[in-house]
Amino acid sequence: MRSLKRENSGSALSVRSSDSEGDSYHNMDIKKLTNKVKEIDISAFDRTRLFNPRKQRSCHKRAEPVSEEHRKKESSKNSREYTKRNRDEIVTCQKLFSEITAIMRRFKQLTEEMSVETVEVKIKSMIKDCQEMLTKYTNLDSNDRFNIGIPEAEDFLAIFREKAHATMLFEHRPESPNMYTENLFKLREQYHKLTDHKDNLNSSKDKTNYASSKSRLNQRIVREQLKSDCWVCWKSINTMMVQGEQLQEYNNELKKDIWNNILAVYHQIFTMFCKYPEYADKEKMERIVEYFAPVSRTPGHLSVVWNPMPNVVKSPRSEEIPEIKVEYEEVPSSSTFLSNNETTIASDMDMSIDRPQSMDMSQTLSPEQTLSPREKLQVQDRKISTTQETPPALPSPSGTLTLPTVPASTLKRKEFGDLLACPTGKRVTIDEPNRAERTETIMPSRQMMYPMVNYQALPMPPQSIPSMIPPFIPTIPSTSTMPPMMPYPNVLLTAAPGDVAPIDSLTPSFLRALEQQKLMAAFLNHAFQKCQK
C-alpha cells in the first residue's frame, strides 16, 4: 500500500487529478478575465528555483570529521528536504495549471461565441424572427423593407467577417522559448536507459539505488511536464486575450450597425402597431432587444439612425395611391424611440413640410375634414392669435362675426311680437341680409383687420431631413373610424424626450405642419389599414 501510494503521488497521472476551477470563471467576460490574468503569478514555471535550497554538494569539505551516525542523520535530513521541495513544486504547478486551464477554456468559449460563424447565424436568425413577427401582425412584407430604406444585413456582416479573419491570424510569441520541452525529452531518454538495465542488478544496494533514481527521475519528468503545459497554456491565454478584445470590439460595432439600421426599425413598428402580440413573440422580441442592449441603447432610451429615403417611393399594396415624390438632402438624421402611447412635442419646429405636388387631396380627404369657408376663417384667426397680439381698440374675432347692429328694443319686439310697444302700433318687420350677403360683408372687413395669408401659396424651401425631426404623431377624432397613422415612408419621425415645448408657444409653422401631417395621415390610411387589429 505504501509503495502504491508513493507511486501515485509522483506519477504523471496525478497531474490531471485536481479539479478544474471553471465554475468561478464561468460568468466572467473578456474584461474581467484580462484583469484576472494580470494578477496571476507565473513564477512557478517562469523561474528556475523558488523552493527550499538544495543540499550542500560533496565538493564542500567539512570543517571537521563527523561520526557515522551524524552523517546518516544529515543524509536523511537532506533527502527529506529534497522530497518535500519536489512535492511542493508539483503541488504548486498543479494548482497553477488548473487555474490557467480554466481561464483558457473561458477565453476559448468567449472567442467561439464571437466567431464569424456564430455571430452570423445568431444575427440572421434574429432578423428573420423580426420579419416573421411583422408579417404576422402587420401588412408589411419583404418588398416594403426596400421601400422604407432598410439595408441588407450582409453589407455589415461582410465588414465584420473581414476584420475577424484578420484578427484570428494573431499569435502571441513570448520572449523566452519553451525550454521545458527540451528538458523533458532528455529526462525521458534517461528514464528509458535506467529501466533497460533493471535486469542486470544483483546486489540489494544496486536495487536500492535504482529505486531511488527512478523515483527522483520520475518526479523531475512530472515537474517538467507540468511546467511545459503551463507555458503552452499561458501562451494560448495571451493569444486569445488579444483576439477576444478585438473580436468584442468588432462585434459591438456590428451590433450597433445592425440595430440602428435594421432591427430598431422593426422594433419600433412592432411596438407601435402590434398592440396585443402573443406571449412567445413578446418574449422573443425582448430577448432580441437585450442582446443588442449593452451597445445600442441605455435604459429607457433607444437610438435610431435613419437613412435618407429614395427619391421616388411607390406603395406596393395598392396601385390606386398616387405616386409620392420626396426629395431629401444628404443630411444625417436621428430620432428617438418612444414607448407606446408616449408622444412629445419638440420645441424646434421651424422646419416646414412640403405638400406633395402629385397628390389630389380632394379625393383623399374624409368628410369630417372638409371645412366650410367660415370654419376655415376661424382656423386662420386662431393661428394668427397665437403669435400676434390683438389691438385693444378692435373687437375680438368672435365679435366680428355677429350680425349688423340692430337696437335691442327692436329685437325684443320682433322676438315676442309686442304690437303695443311699437310707437305706431303696427308690427315692425326687419329685413335681414341672407347668409351669403353677410359673408360677403364680413369677409372684406375681416381681411382689412387681419390680413389673410395663403400659406399654401408661399414659396417653400426644399425639403430636407433635419437632425431632429419634430415628434408629431397625428391622431383622429373619436367619431372617426380611421385609425391613427404615421406619415409614410418616414415611419420613425420622433424626437428626444428632453426637447418639449409648451402648448401655448406653438408657432404658425407648427400649425401648418399639423394640418399637412393630418392630410398625409388620411392619404396613407390605405397603406396601413391592416395594421390596427
From Swiss-Prot:
Keyword hit for Metal-binding: no
Domain of life: Eukaryota
Keywords recorded for this protein, A-Z: Nucleus
Biased composition (Polar residues): 359-372
Coiled coil regions, renumbered to chain: none
Compartment annotation: Nucleus
Main location class: nucleus
Residue stretches of biased makeup (Basic and acidic residues): 61-85, 373-384
Keyword Nucleus: yes
Record protein name field: Calcineurin-interacting protein 3
Gene behind the chain: cnp-3
